[in-house]
UniProtKB/Swiss-Prot annotation:
It is found in: Cytoplasm. This is Large ribosomal subunit protein uL3. It comes from Candida albicans (strain SC5314 / ATCC MYA-2876) (Yeast). The lineage of its organism: Eukaryota, Fungi, Dikarya, Ascomycota, Saccharomycotina. Component of the ribosome, a large ribonucleoprotein complex responsible for the synthesis of proteins in the cell. The small ribosomal subunit (SSU) binds messenger RNAs (mRNAs) and translates the encoded message by selecting cognate aminoacyl-transfer RNA (tRNA) molecules. The large subunit (LSU) contains the ribosomal catalytic site termed the peptidyl transferase center (PTC), which catalyzes the formation of peptide bonds, thereby polymerizing the amino acids delivered by tRNAs into a polypeptide chain. It comes from the Eukaryota.
Length: 389
């Protein structure tokens, strides 16, 4: 091109400003799906931990497409989702200025891993969180019932307080993640009764999501620190002979007014942003107790979802898990929030039935020639390291 272009679309979206570090590492749910009272009572979100990615093979079910009934290879993400424990219920009332918290009722007993969430330094603390509140169940149980009755009478939105069981994961962290999750379906009284029945009980992920469902993933993205404008905004590099650097913006604005407009691309923080990734297809909701949760109808090999040697920088997934199409925000070990979609997606991609033919469980550390240890032993034979001294 021998002349300069006099028009070009701007680089980078202004819809995600400010590009700064997220305040909390857990993904916040700012909106929940619309409540339908005719449906049964159920949670609308769940917390999990990103374990890693794998590869799947399936037949595409898309009539009219040239790829219909043909094999496709796709990337998928494994999210470790140990059962969550319900420890409280919150009632909200509608006001002209939005929802307002009415009252909160906690369970009688809270585990140590969730009580750690209320302390900055657990070891130097007196560890007395909720000891006074728990005494109400012995001395003044009537007050707890009164608060639940208030929620039934005045509240229009009911949410439970549930925490993860991080001790069941390979992570070294001992502090559980606590979140408010909205209950949809049924009347307000049904919601409160459901929450009370599940106090101090586990809720599994298969009671929230199912296969072939489209869900949203809310998480904090991978952080990259302070980055230059070319990497951060994708601006064009300047010509080779440019004075004082190439990876810059040539003109950041007029001389007067003597300030830089907020729309101008600048260097700064890149990554570790709070993001919501929508419409991820659920390929599988697996059970941790199933020793063949990595097998399919076409691949009858008895294997789990874990690759040989475990997921790199995570370990083995021994709990229930969710297999999602594509990649999701965040790094391995990071807590992610899985939420039901805010709207009903009727596209062919959303309504098609998924039938997995093969899930890759080869080692992620090296060439990955074998799917199971038995397959490796059959090919390699007994190795010297396997012999007992």
């Amino acid at each position: 091109m021998s002349h300069r272009k006099y028009e070009a679309p701007r680089h980078g979206s202004l819809g995600f400003l400010p590009r700064k570090r997220a305040a909390k590492q857990r993904g916040r749910v700012k909106s929940f799906p619309k409540d339908v009272k005719s449906k049964p009572v159920a949670l609308t979100a769940f917390l999990g931990y990103k374990a890693g990615m794998t590869t799947i093979v399936r037949d595409l079910d898309r009539p009219g497409s040239k790829m219909h009934k043909r094999e496709v290879v796709e990337a998928a993400t494994v999210v470790d989702t140990p059962p969550m424990v319900v420890v409280g219920v919150v009632g909200y009332v509608e006001t002209p200025r939005g929802l307002r918290s009415l009252t909160t009722v906690w369970a009688e007993h809270l585990s140590e891993e969730v009580r750690r969430r209320f302390y900055k330094n657990w070891y130097k603390s007196k560890k007395k969180a909720f000891t006074k509140y728990s005494g109400k169940y012995a001395t003044d149980a009537k007050q707890v019932e009164t608060e639940l009755a208030r929620i039934k009478k005045y509240a229009s939105v009911v949410r439970v307080l549930a925490h993860t069981q991080i001790k069941k994961t390979p992570l070294s962290q001992k502090k559980a993640h606590l979140a408010e999750i909205q209950i949809n379906g049924g009347s307000v009284s049904d919601k409160v009764d459901w929450a009370k029945e599940h106090f101090e009980k586990e809720v599994s992920v298969d009671s929230v999501f199912e296969q072939d469902e489209m869900i949203d993933v809310i998480a904090v993205t991978k952080g990259h620190g302070f980055e230059g404008v070319t990497h951060r905004w994708g601006t064009k590099k300047l010509p080779r002979k440019t004075h004082r650097g190439l990876r810059k913006v040539a003109c950041i604005g007029a001389w007067h007014p003597a300030n830089v407009n907020w729309t101008v691309a600048r260097a700064g923080q890149n990554g570790y942003h709070h993001r919501t990734s929508i419409n991820h297809k659920v390929y599988r909701v697996g059970k941790g107790t199933d020793e063949a949760n990595g097998a399919t109808e076409f691949d009858r090999t008895k294997k789990t979802i874990n690759p040989m040697g475990g997921f790199v920088r995570y370990g083995n997934v021994n709990n229930d898990f969710v297999l999602l199409k594509g990649s999701i925000p965040g790094v391995k070990k990071r807590v992610v929030t899985l939420r039901k979609s805010l709207y009903v997606d009727t596209s062919r991609r959303a309504v098609e039935k998924v039938n997995l033919k093969w899930i890759d469980t080869a080692s992620r550390f090296g060439k990955g020639r074998f799917q199971t240890p038995a397959e490796k032993h059959a090919f390699m034979g007994t190795l010297k390291k396997d012999l007992e001294n």
